[in-house]
Swiss-Prot record:
EC number(s) per entry: 3.2.1.96
Name of this chain's protein: Endo-beta-N-acetylglucosaminidase F2
Organism ancestry: Bacteria, Pseudomonadati, Bacteroidota, Flavobacteriia, Flavobacteriales
InterPro entries: EndoS_F2-like_TIM-barrel, Glyco_hydro18_cat, Glyco_hydro_18_chit_AS, Glycoside_hydrolase_SF
Function statement: Endohydrolysis of the di-N-acetylchitobiosyl unit in high-mannose glycopeptides and glycoproteins. Complex biantennary glycans are the preferred substrates. Tri- and tetraantennary glycans are not hydrolyzed, and high mannose glycans are very poor substrates.
Annotated GO CC locations: extracellular region
Entry keyword annotation includes Hydrolase: yes
SUPFAM superfamilies the UniProt entry points to: (Trans)glycosidases
Top-level taxon of origin: Bacteria
Hydrolase as UniProt keyword: yes
Family designation: Belongs to the glycosyl hydrolase 18 family.
Amino acid sequence: MKTANFSFALCLSVVIMLFIKCTRSEQDLSVTKDAIAQKSGVTVSAVNLSNLIAYKNSDHQISAGYYRTWRDSATASGNLPSMRWLPDSLDMVMVFPDYTPPENAYWNTLKTNYVPYLHKRGTKVIITLGDLNSATTTGGQDSIGYSSWAKGIYDKWVGEYNLDGIDIDIESSPSGATLTKFVAATKALSKYFGPKSGTGKTFVYDTNQNPTNFFIQTAPRYNYVFLQAYGRSTTNLTTVSGLYAPYISMKQFLPGFSFYEENGYPGNYWNDVRYPQNGTGRAYDYARWQPATGKKGGVFSYAIERDAPLTSSNDNTLRAPNFRVTKDLIKIMNP
């Protein structure tokens, strides 16, 4: 890793500029800058942290992002991003854990480095569980079994990792016995996560579906509904948010877009962000959009670590993120 021979005074100024509250200007968050930040031991001032936390606790449209663990620098050599590079003004980061086995070094880095760092900035760290099949195919298929399964999730991700909540990804409309099991599993989870738990831990329902029978039966148990609106129009957002309106407040509703994933074209390609980055595209439309029945909860992104200066809409090069789009959207939603 290359480092520059800066004086201590210059190093100090770079670090302070990098970590002050809600940075919204464009920055090239290079590997060198991260090395300087970690080696210096300099932290954000108590005043700046206080202001940042106050912003996070205020009534505002939140920004959330799914972070792909297999592209983190702690996961494998050759990767560039670090969760410490995420914008300070990001409200919530979703740990998306594919291709990262339990023995990978990422998990210890998450627990001992990333989570404390992000918590100091008021950023919530949420684990993505995927669907609920693990509850319905393993262990006891009864209330005792579901309760044990849910407690195990809480003990691991809250007790061991000190995370702030969970995300379930439901991309189907379960029926019959599967519906019954999914509802029971969700009720078990809601004793530890969500507005009915009393724990303060967040429960996110992430979906690409209109309200299903499963959702209708479990709606009061979630803090947020994240709609995977990749490739859609704002007209569609208005329609779908109207379908959810009888069951949740619009402040709980967040539409989401996707950054371009490397090697995604043409099969996994949404064109939600225009490249080279120029401040336009579907993601910006989502930030400006509002439901017909109230203000939205915010916007989320998938593959947030791909918020980088790509040269084209199908640039497959792994590049260091600059988070320009994320910071632009935060500013649009909360001017």
